[in-house]
C-alpha cells in the first residue's frame, strides 16, 4: 500500500537509517528538492532516483496508480499499487470513489505503520480530521501479537471544521467517574 510503495523506494537506496529518516522528513514536508539533493550525493540506481523524483506527481485520483506501477522499482512496490487498485474498486462499490485521493508519498510519522495509511478531510479545514492505518507489530508492545488497523479522530480539527461550516454541536455536561484497581 502507500507505505509499501515508499518503503520499497527506501530499501532500493541502500542508505543508512539516518539518511532514510532525513529523506522521510523532507518528503513529509513536501521538500522534494531536498530529497533530490541528498540522493545526488549517493550512488543510487537511476530508476530509484526517478521514482523519488516522480513522488510529487503520485498524488491524485486512480489515474496515478498506472504511473506508479510503471515507475515502481520492484515487485513489492508493484504489488502495493495493485492492492490500492483493488481497494479503490471496493470503494467504488460503496459509491465513495469521488472522495478518494491517493498520495503515494505518505509514510506515516510514527514509524509503526506496516500497511495502508489514510487520512480523512472535510470542508473548512486543510488538516486531516481522521488519521489512521495498519500496524502489524504495535500491539506486540502490549503483549498481543496481532495485526490491527485503527484511526484517531482529531477533535480539535473536527470542531474547527464544524465551526467553519456553521454546524452547531450541542454540548451537555456529564459527570464521569473513572475507577481503576491499581494492583
Predicted features and spans:
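Positively charged, Gly/Ser-enriched RNA/tRNA-binding surfaces
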Residues: 5, 9, 34-183
Amino acid at each position: 500500500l502507500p507505505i509499501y510503495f515508499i518503503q520499497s523506494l527506501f530499501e532500493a537506496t541502500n542508505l543508512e537509517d539516518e539518511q532514510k529518516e532525513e529523506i522521510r522528513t523532507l518528503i513529509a514536508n513536501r521538500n522534494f528538492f531536498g530529497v533530490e539533493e541528498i540522493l545526488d550525493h549517493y550512488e543510487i540506481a537511476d530508476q530509484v532516483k526517478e521514482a523519488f523524483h516522480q513522488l510529487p506527481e503520485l498524488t491524485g485520483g486512480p489515474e496515478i496508480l498506472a504511473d506508479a506501477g510503471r515507475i515502481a522499482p520492484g515487485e513489492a512496490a508493484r504489488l502495493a499499487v495493485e492492492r490500492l487498485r483493488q481497494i479503490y474498486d471496493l470503494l467504488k462499490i460503496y459509491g465513495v470513489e469521488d472522495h478518494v485521493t491517493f498520495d503515494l508519498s505518505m509514510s506515516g510519522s510514527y514509524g509503526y505503520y506496516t500497511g495502508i495509511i489514510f487520512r480523512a478531510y472535510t470542508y473548512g479545514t486543510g488538516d486531516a480530521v481522521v488519521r489512521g492505518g495498519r500496524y502489524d507489530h504495535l500491539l506486540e508492545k502490549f503483549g498481543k501479537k496481532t495485526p490491527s488497523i485503527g484511526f484517531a479522530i482529531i477533535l480539535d480539527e473536527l470542531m474547527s471544521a464544524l465551526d467553519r461550516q456553521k454546524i452547531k454541536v450541542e454540548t451537555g455536561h456529564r459527570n464521569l467517574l473513572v475507577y481503576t484497581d491499581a494492583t
